[in-house]
Structure formats: structure tokens, C-alpha cells
Amino acid sequence: MDLRTALQTFESTRRLLELCSNRTSFLWRWLFGTPLSRLVRQVKLEYEKDFERILDQCPGVFESLELGYHKVFEEKIVKELDFSSPGRAVAAVAFASYLLDRWNTRTHLSPGYQMDYISLNLWKFWLRRRVYNYSRGLPQLGPAAPLARQGSQQEEQQQRQEEEQVQEEMRSGLDPPTEN
């Protein structure tokens, strides 16, 4: 199973995250897991300290998720995920799995909600990035040709501004005001 297939649908993205998380036993992962899920799990375990340092730079992420404020998570975590190459995409999925494990230890929300929320954000961001690359004529992430980082910083900045405009239009009004 390649990475593009694993992120193609919400269900497959959710299954991949579930197989990589700590809530899946070793035996279940070994019997029913895919090589990709084992790879993502291995990356998650190897880079655990780096992921922890990243989370230390974003204080209040889990507290805001507990209160139902998702803007902090979407702006500080999801927008910084990188799918420009297969290795970076695996690292992004590993980081999402790490977030799921950390959120599990600190919450009163149901495990299904947590899994759905992180899977949905990962899947939506991957789709947005894929559509953006397709509209710009950039190669897609796939087994034949890894996506090389192309385009200037100006294009990336323009894309972020477009995403911010879309996010502002879609806000439900539940998020607290942000400090600039």
C-alpha cells in the first residue's frame, strides 16, 4: 500500500492513524497492519523527542482542543505539515499519530472523536495540498515520481493567504479572538 492510496479517502486515513497509534496492540498491528503503518509507527517512535520539542513551542494546543477551540490546532499544527516528498509525508502522518497518542492521555473526549478529528484534519489538508499542486501543474506524490519541492516562496505565501481567507469564511464563531 503506497502513501497516496492510504491518504486517498477519510476511512483509509483513519485506519492508517489507528494502526499507528498506541491504542492498537503489537499483535494486531503485526497480523493486520500494512508495511506503511509499521513504517509510520517506527518513524513516530524514532522522532518522539523531536515531536515533543515541536509541541513545546505550541503551548495550549491540547487545552484549546479540550474546550472545542480548533483554530489554534489548525493554524499552528496542521498548516505546518509538509507533504512535499514521501519521507516528509510519512513524518507528517507520524506526527499526527503522535498527537493522537498525546491527546489520548489528557482528555475526557471520546477516543472515536479524537481519531475522527485528527484523521479528518490530516486528510483535508492532504487533499487541499494535492488540489493546489494539481492546479499549479506540479507533480503529485506517488510511487513513480516523488514530489520535489517546486515553486517559489511567493507562491507558497499566496497559497497560505488563500487558505486563511477560506478558513476565515468557514469559522463558526466559537474560537476565541487571536492575539497578533
Swiss-Prot record:
Disulfide bonds: none annotated. InterPro entries: Adenovir_t-Ag_E1B_19kDa, Bcl-2-like_sf, Bcl2-like. It holds the Pfam family Adeno_E1B_19K. The keyword Ion transport does not apply. Residues 142-180 are annotated as: Disordered. SUPFAM superfamilies: Bcl-2 inhibitors of programmed cell death. Keywords: Early protein, Host-virus interaction, Inhibition of host apoptosis by viral BCL2-like protein, Modulation of host cell apoptosis by virus. Coiled coil: none annotated. Residues 157-172 have a biased composition (Basic and acidic residues). The keyword Calcium does not apply. GO terms for biological process: regulation of apoptotic process; symbiont-mediated suppression of host apoptosis. It comes from the Viruses. Belongs to the adenoviridae E1B 19 kDa protein family. This is E1B protein, small T-antigen.
